[in-house]
Amino acid sequence: WTLDARLTHIGSEGYIDRGATDLKSYMFQAGYYNGNTMLKLISFGGKAKTGLTYTGATKEEMRLNGRRFHTEGMYYTSNGPHSYYYMKDGERQRATVDYYDDQTDNYLQINNQLVLSHRFNEKWTLNATGFYTYGYGYYKQYKDDAELAEYVNLDTEIQEADLIREKIMRNHLGGLNASAAYSVRKLDLAFGGSYSYYSCPHWGVLDWVDGLEGSQIGGRWYDNDVDKHDANLFARANWSVAKGLRLFADLQYRYVSYQAWGVNDNYVSEEVGMQPIDVDKQYHFFNPRAGVSYTLAERNNFYLSFAVAQKEPTRSDFTDRYMFAEANTYPSSEKLYDWELGYQYTAPRLSLGVNLYYMKYKDQLVPTGMV
């Protein structure tokens, strides 16, 4: 038996104003070893709290207010304890401001793994890992003179007001990876599979709106959920055909099911309200890889390979398409064809290598630059 544990705490005030960090983490591991069997229980995680500094500052704001200045959580008040300097009609002006003291990003994550490895004999080995990850996070923001039309549950005719909002997410990820390996003479085989399930609801609430009572604020101003099932099967072979000559091949089948529903945190218009989300897509991927390598005089290795890789769109690919695509259309999955040719020279005190490759993409998902 073996036991290991560790606790860590890191804190910093940060260089940027109100950019402090408070990071706590832990690790625990228990292991059992008995001949050809190993069993491990591993748990690690942490909690982070950091000040929001996303907005940055213009060159003029930094010149007038210092390099550490930013406007996150800032609001104007007649008796504020802080000064904000700006230019108007060529003259430097001063305003009194204060800062919301809980303008923070908060996240908790806990990872658990159960790992099994067993060697049946000289030819067969088995490896399996079960895992579960839990996460919960939110950030709080003070918004000065926010447009209230974007918060659709408010019962008011007021168009702008100061408010405090929270954006929240909770995620669950669980699954199993398993593989077996077989080795005999000049042939090495491996095969296995994995399955994972991911769930991640997102929602937002208003903690306070200037001038409104609690009953006027309403419930969640956006609320959406995501379910993702990801499964794959694979087989891999390495065959030493002759001295210095090796053939290798991989085959993978992957299935992805992705559902998302609800409303996103993007305000579209008075008619539509918040951006609707309605995604139900399934993907079937076959990813082969094959190649050959030849070692000459021990120090020279030549190789040639071909591979296919495919990837489903991300959550942001699905949500962003609403602004640019017709209804009920979805982004395509990416596909990559990769050819590689290479040479490597290895000596006790010197290693040299050259790699030529050609990658052909189909339906590649790339940033457009639009904001």
Where are these regions (language model features)?
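Transmembrane beta-barrel wall of Gram-negative outer-membrane proteins
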Residues: 1-11, 17-53, 112-122
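Face-selective signature of the C-terminal outer-membrane beta-barrel domain
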Residues: 106-268, 293-295, 353-354
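Residue-level signature of outer-membrane beta-barrel architecture
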Residues: 1, 31-34, 118, 181-184, ...
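Extracellular loop and loop/strand-boundary signature of outer-membrane beta-barrel proteins
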Residues: 12-16, 23-25, 97-102, 111-115, ...
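Transmembrane beta-strands of outer-membrane beta-barrel pores
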Residues: 9-13, 34-36, 45-49, 132-136, ...
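Surface-exposed extracellular loop regions of Gram-negative outer-membrane beta-barrel proteins
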Residues: 255-270, 280, 294-339, 351, ...
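Acidic/polar loop-and-plug regions of large Gram-negative outer-membrane beta-barrel proteins
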Residues: 38-113, 141-163
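Flexible, surface-exposed loop regions and adjacent strand-edge segments
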Residues: 21-25, 56-66, 71, 142-153, ...
